[in-house]
Amino acid sequence: MLDLNLDVDSTESTQNERDSITVKGVSLNQMDESVTSNSSVVNAEASSCIDGEDELCSTRTVKFQFEILKGGGEEEEEDDDERSAVMMTKEFFPVAKGMNFMDSSAQSSRSTVDISFQRGKQGGDFIGSGSGGGDASRVMQPPSQPVKKSRRGPRSKSSQYRGVTFYRRTGRWESHIWDCGKQVYLGGFDTAHAAARAYDRAAVKFRGLEADINFVIGDYEEDLKQMANLSKEEVVQVLRRQSSGFSRNNSRYQGVALQKIGGWGAQMEQLHGNMGCDKAAVQWKGREAASLIEPHASRMIPEAANVKLDLNLGISLSLGDGPKQKDRALRLHHVPNNSVCGRNTMMENHMAAAACDTPFNFLKRGSDHLNNRHALPSAFFSPMERTPEKGLMLRSHQSFPARTWQGHDQSSGGTAVAATAPPLFSNAASSGFSLSATRPPSSTAIHHPSQPFVNLNQPGLYVIHPSDYISQHQHNLMNRPQPPP
């Protein structure tokens, strides 16, 4: 069997005497050549004096070894003593709180050695407690403060800023923030710094002044004043509009978004959005613009009052150039708009909105008007015009050349009235009328003397439905569009 008794040899260089102390334990002979462990040896000068004998003790060496491993003889032991004169070994199982390895109260012999030590990290050196040092030689390390853990998770792996992520597909730095368990997109930016600024503004709005941000809170004093009256959704929209990309179908302009069909549209109510589009279309495209709303008086655009459009229709029916035919003409002037207020009419030109006291006028065709011509005041008709044979009446503005009317007998016995006038401006969009319409001259004509009528400032053009005496064929001929000459 192996003898595992451990010998502790205490050698003094000045006294040449050895005191052996047998200690029960398990260790290795750290000074022996066969089983030397250099990693557990620490160079130090052990200067410990026991019982005040400073004059007699100088350097003391403590050595642990197994008896069975001794095999060299006296010469090897003396060589080991000389080499380990300034060596101190490290204890594998140190005694807690600086207690002696052997009970010092039970033994008063000077061979008793305190081999326990405490490793205090001070300047990178190891401090031994010693037998006389006590607690004074110990260096207490101050407790380290725990690192503050972020409440919002770790920083982004692809950026040094919080809430910023770089996407290789788009090549932009995108900013996101978590709110109520959902990730809110704040926009894509060209630089990580701009994305971090957007995240900070959103974090301050969402979580208050105690939010974890990338920069100091003092940089956002002006932004805090501007965001005071805004909601979270409005702040997010503002940040998205300031971004450099439209990857999420958002525009840098307020109220504009990319539609599914591929165009940019306004994010508002349908009626107000259509009115805004119509206003812009009328202003930039004029009569050729297409309307999105029904022409109704309650849906008029009051802001378009300053838009000057020529929506008057001109119908020119040639009756010849003879002086007799010109003398037989009847001049009709402007008819007040208030005489026809309240009529329910329809118009084919969608851009010509119709209402009284508005910048737009009704554009009425024969089939869209009332058959009762007596709806107009009788003062506006001559005695011959009040007869049942009256067919058509054309009302125009005073600034345009006078229109002439001439009637002729038909085989059916009725009377048809034809109007002649020089060509006017181009017709309105989608009106169905051409620039000029031709009519063959007739042999007989009825002369209607001109009557001065009241002139108003608002222009308008009305075509009253022909009388029942005119055949349907003649009525269709009057309203059928003709190509320009």
Curated annotation (Swiss-Prot):
Name of encoding gene: TOE2
Family membership noted in the UniProt record: Belongs to the AP2/ERF transcription factor family. AP2 subfamily.
Stretch list, region Disordered: 124-161
Name assigned to this protein: AP2-like ethylene-responsive transcription factor TOE2
GO cellular component labels: nucleus
Segments of skewed composition (Gly residues): 124-135
InterPro entries referenced in this protein's UniProt entry, alphabetically: AP2/ERF_dom, AP2/ERF_dom_sf, DNA-bd_dom_sf
Compartments, record wording: Nucleus
A Pfam family this chain is assigned to: AP2
UniProt keyword terms in alphabetical order: Activator, DNA-binding, Ethylene signaling pathway, Nucleus, Transcription, Transcription regulation
Biological function: Probably acts as a transcriptional activator. Binds to the GCC-box pathogenesis-related promoter element. May be involved in the regulation of gene expression by stress factors and by components of stress signal transduction pathways. Regulates negatively the transition to flowering time and confers flowering time delay.
Record-level Gene Ontology MF annotations: DNA binding; DNA-binding transcription factor activity; identical protein binding
Triggers of expression: Repressed by miR172a-2/EAT.
Gene Ontology biological-process entries: ethylene-activated signaling pathway
DNA-binding region: 160-216
SMART domains per UniProt: AP2
